[in-house]
């Protein structure tokens, strides 16, 4: 079983904890996750530069993800035009299972290699691919 699909140790007995205990567990988990960012600042800077360079050269920003990460990528990508004026033609979103009818969950799409290969055909030299994962 993948790590992201396993039950977190703090979730055991969660239904027996108070609301405050549950909120504290969730809050502390977010704080721990945020601490990881400081270790990745140089990589984040390089990624931001790659994105800016792609946009300035007229190339695409391509978000690639599955599941809820795909939804986050879509939300981020769609915000770039109104917020930063990046033409929508330079923003592409690849989500396992597609973007149509996202109100229905699609199982087993994350590992569809043929669909991934087909989706990836839009990527061209100079594009910046942003891969998101839970």
Question: Where on the chain are the PLM-derived regions?
Answer:
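Cofactor-/ligand-binding subdomain signature composed of acidic, glycine-rich
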Residues: 1-36
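Short secondary-structure boundary/capping elements
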Residues: 14-18, 43, 108-115
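Well-ordered alpha-helical segments embedded in enzymatic catalytic cores
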Residues: 21, 46-50, 115-118
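Flexible, glycine/charged-enriched surface loops at secondary-structure junctions
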Residues: 36, 44-45, 61, 65
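Glycine-rich oxoanion-binding loops at beta->alpha junctions
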Residues: 37, 81-133
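A short, well-structured juxtamembrane/interface segment
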Residues: 39-56
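A short, small-residue-rich loop immediately preceding and capping a beta-strand
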Residues: 59-68, 125-134
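Glycine-rich loop at the start of a catalytic domain that most often binds anionic cofactors/ligands
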Residues: 68, 74-81
């Amino acid at each position: 079983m993948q790590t992201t699909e396993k039950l977190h140790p703090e979730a055991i007995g969660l239904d027996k904890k108070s609301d405050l205990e549950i909120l504290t567990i969730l809050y502390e988990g977010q704080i721990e996750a945020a601490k990881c960012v400081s270790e990745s600042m140089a990589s984040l800077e390089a990624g931001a530069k790659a994105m800016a360079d792609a946009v300035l050269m007229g190339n695409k920003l391509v978000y690639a993800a599955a599941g809820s990460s795909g939804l986050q990528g879509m939300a981020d990508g769609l915000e770039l035009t109104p917020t930063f004026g990046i033409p929508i033609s330079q923003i592409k979103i690849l989500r396992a299972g597609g973007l149509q009818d996202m109100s229905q969950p699609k199982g087993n799409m994350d590992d569809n290699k043929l669909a991934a290969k087909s989706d990836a055909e839009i990527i061209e030299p100079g594009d910046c691919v942003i891969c998101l994962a839970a």
